């Protein structure tokens, strides 16, 4: 785990970064992408009060929303890091969205997507490349991450 400005960056995950939108991805088996928002994303959003997640069976395209978040200061998409079909969504974060602020890499997972294009996994960032890009966002946004209790 790398920590930069109090922002946690797990080294064992993949990342989809589109501007300031930062999403983490964990591959389960060979074709399931577990998706969530990063520590940076939850800090920039502030206290998340609502999340809408695409339902099971819905097809999503890479870069298009798999969910939408609302906080007191921000509303916007959680982009799908890969194309595929939503096979599960986290009903716990829909009931209690603040879980995303408290545990973005654990209980705060958002959706599971059955990957339809394996080539897109190769386009995700990982390792030092991901860490460097996330550190650049932390610096440019002057972020110091904090978790809500």
Swiss-Prot record:
CC terms in the record's Gene Ontology section: cytoplasm; glycine cleavage complex
Cofactor note: Binds 1 lipoyl cofactor covalently.
TM stretches of this protein: none
Disulfide bonds: none
UniProt entry keywords in alphabetical sequence: Lipoyl
GO biological process terms held by the UniProt record: glycine decarboxylation via glycine cleavage system
Superkingdom of origin: Archaea
Family annotation (NCBIfam families): PRK01202.1 (NF002270)
Subunit structure comment from the entry: The glycine cleavage system is composed of four proteins: P, T, L and H.
Protein's name according to its UniProt entry: Probable glycine cleavage system H protein 2
Record gene name: gcvH2
């Amino acid at each position: 785990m790398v920590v930069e400005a109090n922002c946690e960056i797990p080294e064992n995950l993949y990342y989809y970064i589109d501007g300031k939108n930062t999403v983490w991805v964990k591959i389960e088996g060979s074709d399931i992408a577990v998706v969530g928002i990063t520590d940076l994303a939850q800090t920039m959003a502030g206290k998340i009060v609502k999340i809408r997640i695409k339902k099971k069976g819905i097809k999503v395209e890479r870069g298009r929303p798999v969910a939408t978040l609302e906080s007191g200061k921000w509303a916007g998409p959680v982009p799908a890091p890969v194309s595929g079909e939503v096979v599960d969504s986290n009903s716990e974060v829909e009931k209690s969205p603040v879980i995303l602020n408290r545990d973005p890499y654990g209980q705060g997972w958002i959706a599971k997507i059955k990957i339809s294009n394996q080539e897109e996994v190769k386009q995700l960032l990982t390792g030092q490349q991901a860490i460097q890009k996330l550190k650049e966002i932390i610096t440019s946004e002057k972020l110091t991450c904090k978790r809500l209790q």
